[in-house]
């Protein structure tokens, strides 16, 4: 899987842009706030339908414009494909593959597999549970159509149940309807719990070995999947929580409350780890993500590195750069020193200046 070219129109600070990519390492360099990350965002958007920043479509469209376009050519299994994405301020995005519109943008998941790594990925380690759930969901949606289906339906049912909880306080006759939604919530939620548990077990097998290598065998990193409720206990816990749910007008039990813990030698790295340990844990997580995508899809993901090399010491730079050999990588940075110092071969170098891109 490789991205061959990218065209942008009225996307962020780009009025018009056309880029060709090498199947190996591509560098976008320049000062901060020039538009380097916006190019990575466009690729990520085409893979996941979402901005890695969590931005809404209307925020991505260039100021003073009503719509934006992304066109990307990819090669998968030696066959070229064209992907077109049309963003409008007040309408759902439109997507076409090889000129054929798709009904739901979620159908894009799995066509292009990407791994995005930026300094902000420390938030997976440091911030609240929602960041960690987002990581699990984003990765599993790329790897499993079934997970994507169950997640979409779980969120729909959860919203319906929460809306019903707000009405039950005024109309107790709606309790029978609540039971109907509960059965669907249990069905889809149990499937999510099962897949998340299997995913984290696979990640753990990889991350333990990778982190030991990064820490010269001094540390063992383990990810603990903290399901808010066991799959076998979901129905019982939901019943017990009913009165509380009605009082608070929100569902308090289910995979939307799940979390992950990152433990180094048994200690929670979020609470007790140094910034260096947190960075290394984030790097181990991303390296494990790359390996798992390769194992599951039998293909290599596209790696998007957003100014991460400057955040790592030389040893960790080398570990990361060793891992990208043979993988199409698009890197942003402010200078080329890391690549010169590490003698990394680069096929394409572009300089980004205020929304324009020229060969470096």
From Swiss-Prot:
It is found in: Cytoplasm. Keywords: ATP-binding, Cytoplasm, DNA damage, DNA repair, DNA replication, DNA-binding, Nucleotide-binding, SOS response. Gene3D superfamilies: P-loop containing nucleotide triphosphate hydrolases, RecF/RecN/SMC, N-terminal domain. GO terms for molecular function: ATP binding; single-stranded DNA binding. ATP binds at residues 30-37. It comes from the Bacteria. GO terms for cellular component: cytoplasm. Its main location: cytoplasm. GO terms for biological process: DNA replication; DNA synthesis involved in DNA repair; double-strand break repair; SOS response. Coiled coil: none annotated. HAMAP family: RecF. The RecF protein is involved in DNA metabolism; it is required for DNA replication and normal SOS inducibility. RecF binds preferentially to single-stranded, linear DNA. It also seems to bind ATP. NCBIfam families: recf. Belongs to the RecF family. This is DNA replication and repair protein RecF. It comes from Lachnoclostridium phytofermentans (strain ATCC 700394 / DSM 18823 / ISDg). The lineage of its organism: Bacteria, Bacillati, Bacillota, Clostridia, Lachnospirales. The gene is recF.
């Amino acid at each position: 899987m490789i991205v061959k070219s990218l065209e942008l129109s009225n996307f962020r600070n780009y009025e018009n842009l056309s880029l060709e990519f090498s199947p190996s390492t591509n560098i976008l360099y320049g000062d901060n706030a020039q538009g380097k990350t916006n190019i990575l965002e466009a690729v990520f958007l085409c893979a996941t339908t979402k901005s890695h920043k969590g931005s809404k479509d209307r925020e991505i469209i260039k100021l003073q414009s009503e719509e934006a376009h992304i066109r990307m050519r990819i090669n998968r299994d030696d066959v070229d494909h064209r992907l077109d994405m049309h963003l409008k301020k007040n309408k759902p995005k439109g997507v076409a593959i090889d000129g054929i519109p798709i009904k739901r943008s979620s159908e894009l998941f799995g066509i292009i597999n990407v791994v995005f790594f930026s300094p902000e990925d420390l938030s997976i380690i440091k911030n609240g549970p929602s960041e960690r759930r987002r990581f699990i969901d984003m990765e599993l949606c790329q790897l499993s159509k079934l997970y994507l289906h169950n997640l979409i339906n779980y969120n729909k049912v959860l919203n319906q149940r929460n809306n019903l909880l707000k009405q039950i306080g005024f109309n107790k006759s709606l309790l029978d309807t609540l039971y109907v939604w509960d059965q669907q919530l249990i069905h889809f939620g149990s499937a999510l719990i099962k897949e998340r548990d299997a995913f984290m077990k696979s990640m753990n097998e990889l991350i333990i070995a990778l982190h030991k290598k990064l820490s010269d065998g001094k540390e063992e990193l383990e990810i603990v999947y903290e399901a808010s409720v066991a799959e076998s206990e979901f129905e019982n816990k939901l019943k017990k929580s009913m009165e509380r749910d009605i009082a608070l007008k929100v569902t308090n039990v289910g995979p939307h409350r799940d979390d992950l813990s990152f433990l180094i030698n048994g200690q929670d790295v979020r609470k007790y780890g140094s910034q260096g340990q947190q960075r290394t844990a984030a790097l181990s997580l991303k390296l494990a993500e790359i390996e798992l995508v390769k194992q599951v899809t039998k293909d290599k993901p596209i790696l998007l590195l957003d100014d991460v090399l400057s955040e790592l010491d030389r040893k960790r730079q080398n570990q990361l750069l060793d891992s990208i050999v043979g993988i199409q990588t698009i890197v942003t940075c402010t200078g080329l020193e890391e690549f010169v110092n590490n003698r990394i071969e680069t096929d394409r170098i572009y300089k980004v200046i205020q929304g324009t891109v020229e060969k470096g």
